[in-house]
Swiss-Prot record:
Name of the coding gene: gltX
Motif 'KMSKS' region, residue numbers: 237-241
Protein name: Glutamate--tRNA ligase
Enzyme class: ligase
Upper classification of the organism: Bacteria, Pseudomonadati, Pseudomonadota, Gammaproteobacteria, Enterobacterales
Residues binding ATP: 240
Location in or out of the cell: Cytoplasm
Molecular function in Gene Ontology: ATP binding; glutamate-tRNA ligase activity; tRNA binding; zinc ion binding
Species of the source: Salmonella enteritidis PT4 (strain P125109)
Length: 471
């Protein structure tokens, strides 16, 4: 049997992390078994579905590099197919027209609730032989079996059983002629030959209804696997108040797709004690049997740790391709300064996100107008004038500009003045970066460049001179 899975989001908003994890599990299962992965856009909610949401979903999938083999399919382009199947069901007697008014249905609901019963349609039109005009408004309902039960072997949770007496005669076509979500899903899974439906646990109650429709159509029934929800670290359902929940928001916040994928795959699935997984390892090791039945707690600190790991272990040239977007958001002109791959090497240890990296690298490319006030007050004092003058002259004398020779110049200055490295290094750091913190000083000065470093030292000396004149 050829394995075929699908990811079927509704385009009513962005791609959130719960949906992304479902997509990842479906994608991994298909890839593990050498099968196919289908992208389907379930846009039957015409009022809430938007082109912007569709674009956001596609952007999220592409950024995560979860490539699909078929699609994207759009349900709104398949209405003729759905309605043709409904018409066949009406002919076969597995569906029927319902003319009950909203008022009657509301009254029925109130009466059932008053008796402590579960609200459900009472089947009045199912057994009615009353004549109606062809143009009289009606819905079409599925004639759900009235006895027995539906049992399916959930690939994560084990056997689940529903009594047919608990299930309603589901509306499959509205009065305006449009098919409903639960019906469209069934026909799509049938037509697209989906073998495994991997989705959120909020769909468990839909499953027996969909299985009954498939059986009425003499269609094969796929295997089902329902993934538990993701909670915030406070145990409540993950929401905006827990921070970013949109996949692309994590991109905007400076996370690498590898970090988010690695984090999401472990959010409910495990393989021993292993924490770090390459994409290839995920594909090789993934199984639905190792997915937890329990809800998972989203831990941003863990994601941040993974992101820092990947910034420092992936090829700098690759990380730089993602950093470029953040550099552009900061409007930094990188033509006069180190290559971005070099910047990744310089700042990788200090920065946990690419956004942080982009926001802390401007001094490598552009001159600053002011020194950080606290750093200048502490380190650009009259006592720093001589160390800065000496180190400037030694840097000027370097003919082979390298980090190693920069280091020798700083060390030689400290030796000549018989002071500790900090007495030279800290004023120099503030002079060339404008702040009190940076990567190792030798590689920083080297990356900034000889001419620019000397110009900035002279600027710092001018700052010190002005400070002396005011005392």
């Amino acid at each position: 049997m050829k394995i075929k899975t699908r990811f079927a989001p509704s385009p009513t908003g962005y791609l959130h992390v719960g949906g992304a994890r479902t997509a990842l599990y479906s994608w991994l299962f298909a890839r593990h078994h050498g099968g196919e992965f289908v992208l389907r856009i379930e846009d039957t909610d015409l009022e809430r579905s938007t082109p912007e949401a569709i674009e956001a979903i596609m952007d999220g999938m592409n950024w995560l590099n979860l490539e699909w083999d078929e699609g994207p399919y759009f349900q709104t382009k398949r209405f003729d197919r759905y309605n043709a199947v409904i018409d066949e069901m009406l002919e076969a007697g597995t569906a029927y027209k319902c003319y009950c008014s909203k008022e009657r249905l509301e009254q029925l609901r109130e009466e059932q609730m008053a008796k402590g019963e579960k609200p459900r349609y009472d089947g009045r039109c199912r057994h009615s032989y009353e004549h109606h005009a062809d143009d009289e408004p009606c819905v079409v309902r599925f004639a759900n079996p009235q006895d027995g039960s539906v049992i399916f072997d959930d690939q994560i949770r084990g056997p689940i059983e529903f009594s047919n007496q608990e299930l309603d005669d589901l509306i499959i076509r509205r009065t305006d002629g449009s098919p409903t979500y639960n019906f469209c899903v069934v026909v799509d899974d049938w037509d697209m030959e989906i073998t495994h439906v991997i989705r959120g646990e909020d769909h468990i109650n839909n499953t027996p209804r969909q299985i009954n429709i498939l059986k009425a159509l003499n269609a094969p029934v796929p295997m089902y696997a329902h993934v538990s929800m993701i909670n915030g670290d406070d145990g409540k359902k993950l929401s905006k108040r827990h921070g970013a929940v949109s996949v692309m928001q994590y991109r905007d916040d400076g996370y690498l797709p590898e970090a988010l994928l690695n984090y999401l795959v472990r959010l409910g699935w495990s393989s021993g004690d292993q924490e770090i997984f390459t994409r290839e390892e995920m594909i090789k090791l993934f199984s639905l049997g190792a997915v937890s039945k329990s809800a998972s707690a989203f831990n941003t600190d863990k994601l941040l740790w993974l992101n820092h790991h990947y910034i420092n272990t992936l090829a700098p040239e690759y990380v730089a391709t993602h950093l470029q977007w953040h550099i552009e958001q900061e409007n930094i002109d990188t033509r006069n300064g180190p290559q971005l791959a070099e910047l990744v090497k310089l700042l990788g240890e200090r920065c946990k996100t690419l956004k942080e990296m982009a926001q802390s690298c401007r001094y490598f490319y552009e001159d600053f107008s002011e020194f950080d006030a606290d750093a200048a007050k502490k380190h650009l004092r009259p006592v720093a004038r001589q160390p800065l003058e000496v180190v400037r002259d030694k840097l000027s004398a370097i003919t082979d500009w390298s980090a190693e020779n920069v280091h020798h110049a700083i060390q030689a200055t400290a030796d000549e003045l018989e002071v500790g490295m900090g007495k030279v290094g800290m004023p120099l750091r503030v002079a060339v970066t404008g702040a009190g913190q940076s990567p190792a000083l030798d590689v920083t000065v080297h990356a900034i460049g000889k001419t620019r470093s000397i110009e900035r030292i002279n600027k710092a000396l001018g700052f010190i001179a002005e400070r002396e004149s005011q005392q």
